[in-house]
Regions:
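Solvent-exposed soluble domains appended to multi-pass membrane proteins
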Residues: 1-158
Length: 158
């Protein structure tokens, strides 16, 4: 139909090129993650998004800045579980922040993290690769930040 239409006949030569779908390998997404996780805005909902971007980027220093801003803006609200999971993990990985007085959920954070560690140590002793461990632990821990941190690599949101 296009070839028969007088108006479209004029542009048909412009369509003679190799049509290849391409991408930027996530560079645009990484730019946006970095931009938003470093943005300053006093709006609580905006600040929560900066914390989410810091979680996705797995940047520990950036996480702590955003975490404390979030805690200050939501002082009377319970801390969401994934934020507690990240704070507990990062506090144990790097001793730059004292987490000893943070009110972590005893069962959902402390107990579950102990189970996560036991499972990962057991699978490591069995000689599993990181990929195999991730798959084995996904049913029980796939909904945790810990699982995301250790087993999700090269994540793209699209």
């Amino acid at each position: 139909l296009i070839a028969q239409n007088e108006e479209f006949k004029l542009i048909l030569p412009l369509r003679k090129f190799k049509d290849v779908l391409d991408g930027d390998e996530g560079l645009c997404e990484m730019y946006l993650l970095n931009y938003f996780s470093n943005s300053q805005n006093p709006e609580p909902m905006f600040q929560e998004q900066t914390l989410v971007y810091a979680l996705v980027s797995k940047d520990i220093d950036r996480f702590w800045k955003r975490f404390f801003q979030y805690a200050t803006l939501h002082i009377k609200e319970p801390m969401p579980i994934h934020y507690q999971e990240a704070a507990f993990l990062y506090g144990n990985l790097e001793k730059t922040v004292d987490i000893s007085k943070m009110p972590f959920d005893r069962d959902r954070i402390l107990g579950r993290f102990a189970n996560f560690q036991r499972a990962s140590q057991m699978y490591a002793r069995e000689g599993m690769s990181v990929e195999q461990m991730g798959e084995a632990m996904r049913p029980e821990f796939g909904d945790t930040f810990w699982w995301f941190y250790f087993f999700c690599k090269g994540v793209k949101s699209y």
